Amino acid sequence: MTAPALITFAPDQAGEAVFDHPAEARRVSGNPQRVTLPFYTDALGEFDAGEWTCEPGAWRIAFGAHRQEFFSVIEGRIRISDPEGNASEFGPGDACVIPAGFEGVFEVVEPVRKHFVMFERKATA
């Protein structure tokens, strides 16, 4: 049996870039372009890893009960605020987990590039 190959974040290993903007109903400020470079998705479609870049702007986020994210900022600066207004800032070298059920505001203060791992458990019957 052959072991699965390691997944690196080398530029030539990325999938096709996905360009989007926050939904209008969620926007707080700006209309930033977001670019997601996927590097890995598991066979069940529950676990994704990649690189994400974004222009300055802010939008509301609401993670479902089964969705969570780990990220590590490579460059730029972001701020995440909870509904009570408590804010945390992250810059190069900082990392964070956004837990399942989190709601708040995600703000890109300076153009940002981060690595991310997203896990979203699929509903079971």
Predicted regions mapped to residue ranges:
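Well-ordered beta-strand positions in beta-sheet-rich domains
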Residues: 51, 87-89, 103-105
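A short, N-terminal "cap"/entry segment at the start of jelly-roll beta-barrel domains
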Residues: 1-46
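Short, conserved beta-strand element in jelly-roll/cupin
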Residues: 64-80
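Conserved short histidine dyad/triad with adjacent acidic residue
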Residues: 48-65, 99-100
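Short hydrophobic/aromatic-rich beta-strand segments that constitute the beta-sheet cores
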Residues: 61, 80, 114-116
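Short, charged/polar surface micro-motifs in flexible loops or helix N-caps
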Residues: 44-47, 55-59, 77, 122
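Ligand-binding loop in jelly-roll beta-barrel domains
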Residues: 92, 100-123
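Short acidic-glycine-tyrosine-enriched beta hairpin
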Residues: 84-100
